[in-house]
Curated annotation (Swiss-Prot):
InterPro entries according to UniProt: Cyt_b/b6_C (IPR005798), Cyt_b/b6_C_sf (IPR036150), Cyt_b/b6_N (IPR005797), Cytb/b6-like_sf (IPR027387), Cytochrome_b (IPR030689), Cytochrome_b_C_euk/bac (IPR048260), Cytochrome_b_N_euk/bac (IPR048259), Di-haem_cyt_TM (IPR016174)
Cofactor: heme b
Membrane topology recorded in Swiss-Prot or TrEMBL: Multi-pass membrane protein
Pfam annotation, one family: Cytochrom_B_C
Record organism: Ctenomys porteousi
Record-given protein name: Cytochrome b
Variant or mutagenesis effect after changing L307M: In strain: Isolate I539
Miscellaneous comment text of the record: Heme 1 (or BL or b562) is low-potential and absorbs at about 562 nm, and heme 2 (or BH or b566) is high-potential and absorbs at about 566 nm.
Amino acid sequence: MTNTPQSHPLIKIVNHSFIDLPAPSNISAWSNFGSLLGVCLGLQLLTGLFLAMHYTADTTTAFSSVTHICRDVNYGWLIRYMHANGASMFFIFLYFHIGRGIYYGSYTFMDTWNIGVLLLFAVMATAFMGYVLPWGQMSFWGATVITNLLSAIPYIGPTLVEWIWGGFSVDKATLTRFFAFHFILPFIITAMVMIHLLFLHETGSNNPSGMNSDSDKIPFHPYYTIKDILGILFMMITLMSLVMFTPDLLGDPDNYTPANPLNTPPHIKPEWYFLFAYAILRSIPNKLGGVLALVFSILILMLFPILHSSKQRSMSFRPLSQCLMWMLVANLLILTWIGGQPVEHPFITIGQLASVTYFFIILILMPSTALMENKLLKW
């Protein structure tokens, strides 16, 4: 028997995943974000690899090595800013991707959804550790504040913090291990993405109607490959505009000052994509309570399949639930704004109200509204 190219095991996998994959005929542009995240991950891996070739993970030379990359390495500034702003794009797409999953009820694919939440945690950990590497003021103090949160864990907390630091403060050992983890985690994320896709292809993709689409499937290529390429084109235009015109727009000016353990910046804050969680953390006066609220604000995503009480899967035909969904989005934008503000009146109160509202919408309003919609539709 002659060996056709499609009988090769590797080509077969690619073929079943990206070419002959049966896809619903009505999936909208919201479904583009999965492929955009894949491209973002590839871009981050590549730019990160080139940065690692010139970076030194030592407290005395880390800051200078980043400066050296920007000044002396051929197109080093481009690689550095593509990596920094690529992370911002990554999180924008992540939040859109999760939002799409909530809106269209994709969380009913529990295996895919849960590995997705774990992926979110892994990406957040990677981004946090990457932010520490340039060893600027905000890198150092961000690392100090966030790692210190673990000391709120009863009994083992303080020991755990010192164990993570590798000493009695954030220092050389901390920077070295953060670089090691920041380098290895994206490869673990890539493996998790493959598992994420494996679980998705077990069930097939969801679609905006939320109904079974087995009766109306089309091949992924050429229909959705072209659609994805258009999305990638838009992404690259946005990213390159950001990199070329305003590369520091989303960064913190404090990070252009080398780390100084003796001088605390007036406002310690993380990158913009963590501000909503940071606002929730700060809104609770108790340290342990704040840490629990912070963790639960992300872990709550795992409860969506359990809290789903509607007889319909998608929100496409549920106007009341749609209103709540957009209320949740507005609430998250308010939290993001508050996270970047100083801890003073009226921001403290606004942050506390927004934090309570966040949990209230997800845990109480959404499930009860879904039940009410069932009643209104006499289901």
